[in-house]
């Protein structure tokens, strides 16, 4: 189906104006108002980061969600993401879930439009209507998600499948609607309007990012999701996203997710009345044969749109094997330890991990004045205003959304074939010359990150030629001879973002190499100062350029006179009975794709949703301590701290914790090997890290052992040695040198912390374990050591050593 030219042209040049840009005071007020009802939850607010496939239940054994890693075929997510990426547009409708800003979000499939000013209700979304010919690209991913849902929650799937009206199914599944989110960190919310008797499904379709976990706010659990992951969950529990984890300001990232659900209002009487009205109307048109010949009314259940009741869990690191599918072989043993560890008055956590699960007077958190706004990286990185277009945050982020309009497949609908061919040739020529020069620069310096623009080069001339074509493309899109200043601003911003992306994606250059700033300066030369080069050119070059400019203008005018493209009736006024006209059969066998049912059976073969069996025998735990390198019972930390560090505000904040002071005043923990401990049917033995026993156990706990192994290769090998001693899993207990708020901090606060953190934790390790130069690692560094599968990360709350426990499967990596 061809796009609506008028609508597309309006969207191309629909950029924010100065009047639309709010003042900082207005933005702050809007943010404060939004987070009152929809607060953001950072990683620091949670206890568990869950990395693997698993079944997560509440305190009464009710399923919160089932997460499946790499559950979708690559081709299915690729096909769907290519189409659905354009469905996520700026919308104020969900701004309360984004700190008062308009996120990139959209809907597809069918929608009821109840409460919307749209006159015609209960029908296809505008996106599906306008992309009907391309819509089948989503069918494989919808089919695969539906079958995964059916295999892990058959009763919920059946209830939803029985209730959904057949006329609004997406490809025969129990889903009526898709919500597509791009670069959207959601604040805490429940999904209003979903069918109460079923579940929602979320899939990550595309992206490169860290963080942005799906957080279940009332349970302190984060589920990390990457492309191809799926989660089937109760969306009536409050959920949100944690912060994006950027190593530096302006780091590039993207994330595209899709939520699959049944919009319950589509099964209410008002919607059925609309379906029937349209059907009766269609019967009066002898030239129209509807795909669906009748409307079967179904029982829709009671949909109250209320949050699900919360039955909290009492977590511990031993809760993870009770959840993770790859650790179900040791789930019963883990439950024995978990129950004992979380019992009132239990000190098992201190015995195994060196400190309790929670400390009330740990290192104090920073105030909001030290933190970034939770939606601060929603748009592209901030840029200064310079040259040919506005580099403001809002203008550039809008251009990122619209750069697709300069792709050839879009332009082919709106400009003449002759002008399109000129555009493709000029664009290709410039990229070829840029690529040639970049290759030469890398040959001289392989570490080079910046592109050196030579004003007298062939590449520079090719850029001006491309700008000449681009200017006529702009006028062709506008359908007039002169562009308004705001239209020029919009186009050249989009043009620069398009070329920046082309250099990165097609030439594999760093984004900073052909930066927007560099392109902006050259556009300023073209638009405002480029003519100064013209008078210095040889007469033959001046003539060539004038003739070329005339040819480009003629090509553009030819496109304007060739007549408008045929377009479909406007979606707003579409009153036809066009339900299911977009449907078609997917021939999985012809494409050699696995049938969704067989694929789901394989993916879910290890899923466990029932109760755990009871363990009767002895559960054996080995706790490994660092060798005692020092016999000192107490170390004066002040002796080794430079004055500049000791007087810093960050050092004072860290040292202000009563829990930290207790650690500094306590005796070294590993001066001698503790005797074995028996707690019910749990037997705990201890060993120093250089003298591992050879007999097998159920679980191995490495208590700050890796901090005394500075070499990463040796540290990774040690984890493998420990894994060979257990039938269950390994618990890697270590300091995370990055504080729990690290990725939410402003740059200055992060720098202040980085300046003192390593020395601070080394002091605590020296006191606690006698490790004189502890290798304290970041979360990423710790996880890179794990040679098998890291199932989860447990964060000891308020820990003065910022201790985390990584739960590691002994099985090889998938």
Curated annotation (Swiss-Prot):
Gene: JBP1
Acetylation listed as a keyword: no
One annotated GO biological process: base J metabolic process
Originating species: Leishmania major
Cofactor(s) of this protein: Fe(2+)
Region named Thymine dioxygenase: 62-264
Function: Dioxygenase that catalyzes the first step of DNA base J (beta-d-glucosyl-HOMedU) biosynthesis by converting thymine to 5-hydroxymethyluracil (HOMedU). DNA base J is a hypermodified thymidine residue found in the genome of kinetoplastid parasites, which is localized primarily to repetitive DNA, namely the telomeres, and is implicated in the regulation of antigenic variation. Also specifically binds to base J-containing DNA (J-DNA).
Subunit structure: Monomer. Binds to DNA as a monomer.
Name by which UniProt lists this protein: Thymine dioxygenase JBP1
Predominant cellular place of this UniProt entry's protein: nucleus
E.C. code: 1.14.11.6
């Amino acid at each position: 189906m061809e796009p609506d030219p008028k609508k597309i042209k309006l969207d191309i040049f629909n950029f924010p104006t100065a009047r639309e840009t709010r003042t900082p005071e207005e933005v702050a007020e809007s943010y404060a108002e939004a987070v009152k009802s929809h607060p953001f939850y950072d990683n620091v607010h949670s206890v568990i980061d869950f990395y693997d496939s698993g079944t997560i239940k509440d305190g009464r054994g009710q399923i919160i969600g089932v997460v499946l890693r790499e559950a979708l075929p690559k081709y299915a997510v690729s096909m769907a993401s290519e189409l659905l990426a354009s469905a996520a547009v700026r919308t104020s409708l969900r701004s309360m879930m984004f700190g008062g800003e308009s996120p990139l979000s959209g809907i597809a499939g069918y929608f009821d439009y109840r409460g919307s000013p749209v006159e015609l209700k209960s029908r296809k979304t505008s996106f599906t209507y306008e992309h009907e010919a391309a819509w089948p690209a989503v069918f494989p991913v919808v089919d695969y998600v539906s079958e995964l849902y059916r295999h892990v929650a058959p009763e919920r799937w059946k209830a939803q499948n029985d209730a959904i009206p057949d006329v609004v199914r997406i490809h025969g599944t129990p889903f009526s609607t898709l919500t597509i989110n791009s670069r959207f960190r959601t604040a805490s919310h429940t999904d209003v309007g979903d069918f109460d008797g079923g579940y929602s499904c979320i899939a990550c379709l595309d992206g490169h990012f860290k963080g942005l976990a799906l957080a279940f706010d009332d349970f302190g659990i984060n589920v990390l999701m990457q492309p191809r992951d799926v989660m089937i969950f109760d969306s009536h529990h409050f959920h949100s996203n944690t912060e994006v984890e950027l190593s530096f300001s302006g780091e590039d990232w993207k994330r595209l997710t899709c939520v699959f659900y049944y919009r319950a209002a589509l099964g209410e009487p008002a919607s059925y009345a609309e379906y029937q009205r349209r059907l009766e109307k269609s019967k009066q048109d002898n030239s129209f044969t509807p795909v669906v010949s009748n409307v079967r009314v179904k029982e829709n259940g009671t949909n109250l749109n209320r949050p699900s009741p919360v039955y909290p869990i009492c977590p511990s690191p031993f809760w993870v094997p009770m959840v993770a599918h790859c650790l179900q072989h040791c789930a019963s043993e883990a439950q024995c330890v978990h129950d004992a560890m979380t019992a009132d008055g239990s000190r098992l956590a201190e015995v195994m991990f060196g400190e309790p699960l929670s400390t009330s007077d740990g290192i104090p958190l920073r105030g909001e004045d030290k933190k970034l706004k939770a939606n601060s990286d929603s748009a592209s990185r901030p840029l200064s205003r310079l040259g040919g277009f506005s580099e403001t945050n809002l203008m550039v982020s809008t251009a990122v959304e619209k750069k697709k309009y300069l792709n050839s497949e879009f332009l082919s609908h709106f400009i003449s074939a002759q002008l399109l061919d000129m555009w493709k040739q000029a664009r290709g020529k410039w990229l070829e010359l840029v690529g040639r020069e970049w290759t030469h620069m890398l040959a001289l310096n392989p570490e080079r990150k910046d592109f050196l623009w030579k004003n007298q080069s062939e590449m520079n001339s090719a850029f001006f030629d491309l700008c000449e074509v681009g200017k006529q493309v702009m006028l062709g899109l506008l359908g007039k001879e002169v562009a308004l200043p705001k239209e020029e601003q919009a186009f050249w911003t989009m043009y620069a973002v398009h070329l920046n992306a082309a250099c990165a994606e097609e030439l594999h250059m760093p984004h900073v190499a052909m930066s927007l700033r560099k392109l902006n300066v050259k556009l300023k030369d073209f638009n405002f100062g480029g003519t100064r080069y013209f008078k210095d050119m040889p007469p033959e070059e001046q003539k060539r350029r004038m003739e070329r400019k005339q040819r480009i203008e003629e090509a553009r005018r030819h496109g304007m006179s060739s007549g408008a493209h045929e377009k479909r009736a406007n979606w707003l006024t579409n009153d036809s009975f066009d339900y299911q006209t977009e449907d078609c059969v997917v021939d999985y066998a012809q494409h050699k794709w696995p049938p969704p049912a067989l694929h789901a059976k394989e993916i879910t073969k290890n899923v466990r949703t029932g109760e755990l069996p009871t363990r009767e025998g002895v559960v054996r735990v080995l706790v490994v301590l660092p060798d005692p390198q020092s016999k000192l019972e107490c170390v004066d930390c002040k002796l080794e701290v430079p004055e500049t560090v000791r007087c810093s505000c960050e050092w004072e904040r860290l040292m202000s914790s009563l829990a930290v002071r207790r650690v500094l005043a306590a005796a070294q923990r590993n001066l001698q090997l503790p005797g074995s401990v028996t707690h019910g049917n749990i037997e705990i033995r201890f060993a120093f890290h250089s003298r591992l026993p050879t007999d097998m156990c159920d679980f191995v706990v490495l208590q700050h052992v890796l901090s005394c192994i500075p070499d990463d290769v040796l540290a990774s090998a040690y984890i493998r040695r420990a894994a060979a001693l257990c039938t269950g899993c390994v618990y890697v207990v270590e300091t995370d040198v990055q504080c729990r708020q690290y990725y939410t901090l402003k740059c200055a606060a992060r720098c202040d912390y980085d300046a003192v953190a390593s020395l601070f934790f080394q002091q605590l390790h020296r006191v606690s374990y006698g490790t004189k130069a502890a290798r304290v690692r970041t979360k990423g560094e710790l996880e890179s050591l794990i040679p098998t599968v890291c199932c989860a990360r447990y964060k000891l709350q308020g820990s003065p050593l910022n201790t985390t426990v990584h739960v590691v499967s002994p099985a090889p990596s998938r």
